[in-house]
Amino acid sequence: MRRHAIILAAGKGTRMKSKKYKVLHEVAGKPMVEHVLESVKGSGVDQVVTIVGHGAESVKGHLGERSLYSFQEEQLGTAHAVQMAKSHLEDKKGTTIVVCGDTPLITKETLETLIAHHEDANAQATVLSASIQQPYGYGRIVRNASGRLDRIVEEKDATQAEKDINEISSGIFAFNNKTLFEKLTQVKNDNAQGEYYLPDVLSLILNDGGIVEVYRTNDVEEIMGVNDRVMLSQAEKAMQRRTNHYHMLNGVTIIDPDSTFIGPDVIIGSDTVIEPGVRINGRTEIGEDVVIGQYSEINNSTIENGACIQQSVVNDASVGANTKVGPFAQLRPGAQLGADVKVGNFVEIKKADLKDGAKVSHLSYIGDAVIGERTNIGCGTITVNYDGENKFITIVGKDSFVGCNVNLVAPVTIGDDVLVAAGSTITDDVPNDSLAVARARQTTKEGYRK
């Protein structure tokens, strides 16, 4: 059976009090609507239509070709929003799910189960519900004497008795697609808001003797809608807790989960230890037996088995097996560290390739460079790579030793087994097996201060 999805993402989000389009506010480093799209796609849906309004181009820019789009010029209610997908879906057969773009915690597993429940029951519609202690603001699930759905009533249209009901509609539905678009044309806006409500489609189906199911989830967090910054922070916390829980169950030690942020796309191997205050974002992959020291930040990087990152920042970089970084080092985009490399305190590496066993232990800048195997770069060494207009490359061969306080003025090549004396400013290439000294000779005047 074909499956389709409609993501409702046209709301202005005035309660966010933001210039940013509501569904583009981020949870765990990713726009809310992108979380929703990934869960929808993961549930086995064949085609997705996202309903957009003001800020449509921004949403399209994030979701790209993963979705089709329909524009809702006026926000006249959820049924009206769904009807905007008519040109894409009206003639389709199968099941269509409707999901709100501000529910970033919904999982593909719950959507899969909702669809399966709906199709197994041969229902025309199924609503995802949950029981919560404080149902204010949600539509209530009103059941009849036999316990089946009678109707869904919105908060502003509910009687006091209905407001006392704690089973709520999540705003997530599964429909027989043909039935959905037939009934949408019959929805009226005679309610307190003057809007066209999608839950009224369920009442129309019931009035015609159709089957409407309720599938209740036990995970209330999943259906949390985000309407303001307070709810955004709650969703962030819930996502963080869920992600950290997943990694811990898969063999990762997270010493203080409450202070540790790990993005949803991060991969971490077993027996890795994450210390307090760490942030790991983007498409980062961390191997086994790694230690990520407290207050480190890692973005879109690869850390191989046995490496150790201590109180450092790693952006768009790769760190080889058993390599030590930090404390207080910065790996900028393009930094590539081989195995058994050491990058020590107050070292900055940018667009540089440090081969296996290379060492840059303290107070150095290595940019646009290649450092050979087992080469030692002394304290205070600077690759002088920029002339004000262009960047130039520094190459240092293997098994070389660069003394302290050396300037390597690019473009320059230092060969293998070279010794560069401390305090030198190197402007010319140095061949293999050489000693390079480029500094003024010391003059000592005895008794000068007497």
Curated annotation (Swiss-Prot):
Query: Which segments carry the region annotation Linker?
Result: 230-250
Which pathway? Nucleotide-sugar biosynthesis; UDP-N-acetyl-alpha-D-glucosamine biosynthesis; N-acetyl-alpha-D-glucosamine 1-phosphate from alpha-D-glucosamine 6-phosphate (route II): step 2/2; Nucleotide-sugar biosynthesis; UDP-N-acetyl-alpha-D-glucosamine biosynthesis; UDP-N-acetyl-alpha-D-glucosamine from N-acetyl-alpha-D-glucosamine 1-phosphate: step 1/1; Bacterial outer membrane biogenesis; LPS lipid A biosynthesis
Annotated spans, Pyrophosphorylase: 1-229
Q: Which Gene3D superfamilies match?
A: Hexapeptide repeat proteins (2.160.10.10), Spore Coat Polysaccharide Biosynthesis Protein SpsA, Chain A (3.90.550.10)
Residues reported to bind acetyl-CoA = N385, Y386, A422, R439
**Chief place of localization:** cytoplasm
Give the multimer and partner information: Homotrimer.
Q: What is this protein called?
A: Bifunctional protein GlmU
- Lineage summary: Bacteria, Bacillati, Bacillota, Bacilli, Bacillales
Q: Name the gene.
A: glmU
